């Protein structure tokens, strides 16, 4: 009986400790880890250029209302990865060079005050911007051709949303932004830079 009395408090204590992980919120180390969206499962667009340079002209300020540095995934890094996945040089004897220029990859926030003084129904509105230009330069005659896409996405959530939920919303926001951008930029390349595309999509002909 003495042994049983000694074991019982230990068992109760063990149950209490194991239950703490569900009673208390997750620490930052236990938050889900997110990664930038990738498009390497799609067939890349092959250009008749000998090189593709990826250039970022975006400079984060790290001060509000700019909050892109708080996101679990970087829009700027995602843009660079998109260019690596989707745009390929395919004519190494050519004197033409392609540039993927990231002009904007920022996020701003705006507090929207609620009209209820008793309950906090303030909201935070986020706007993610992505502006990319693809430019092809022919070094033989210094001619240029380019196409540009300005994509944006907005999200409004309650101001008291916890960090784990915020990161989940932010990650979804970035993924949707790039899914839309990927479609728009692919269309623009086929329309405006078509003469430089080697693997043009085949349009079926029906009789």
Language model feature labels by segment:
Residues 1-21:
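Sec-dependent bacterial lipoprotein signal peptides
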Residues 87, 104-106, 130-140, 151-159, ...:
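Beta-strand elements of well-folded, non-transmembrane domains
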Residues 94-146:
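Surface-exposed short loop/turn segments
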Residues 14-39:
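Bacterial Sec signal peptide processing site at the extreme N-terminus
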């Amino acid at each position: 009986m003495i042994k049983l009395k000694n074991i019982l408090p230990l068992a109760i204590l063990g149950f209490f400790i194991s239950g703490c992980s569900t009673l208390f919120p997750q620490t930052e180390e236990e938050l889900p880890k997110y990664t930038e969206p990738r498009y390497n499962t799609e067939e890349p667009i092959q250009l008749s250029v000998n090189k593709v340079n990826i250039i970022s002209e975006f400079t984060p300020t790290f001060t509000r209302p700019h909050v892109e540095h708080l996101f679990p995934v970087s829009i700027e890094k995602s843009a660079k990865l998109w260019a690596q996945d989707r745009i390929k040089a395919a004519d190494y004897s050519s004197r033409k060079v392609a540039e993927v220029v990231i002009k904007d990859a920022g996020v701003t926030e705006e507090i929207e005050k609620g009209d209820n003084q008793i309950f906090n129904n303030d909201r935070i509105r986020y706007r993610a911007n992505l502006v990319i230009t693809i430019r092809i330069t022919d070094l033989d005659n210094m001619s240029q051709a380019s196409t540009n896409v300005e994509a944006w996405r907005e999200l409004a959530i309650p101001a008291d949303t916890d960090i784990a939920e915020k990161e989940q919303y932010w990650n979804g926001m970035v993924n949707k932004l790039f899914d839309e951008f990927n479609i728009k930029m692919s269309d623009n390349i086929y329309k405006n830079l078509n003469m430089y595309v080697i693997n043009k999509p085949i349009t079926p002909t029906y009789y």
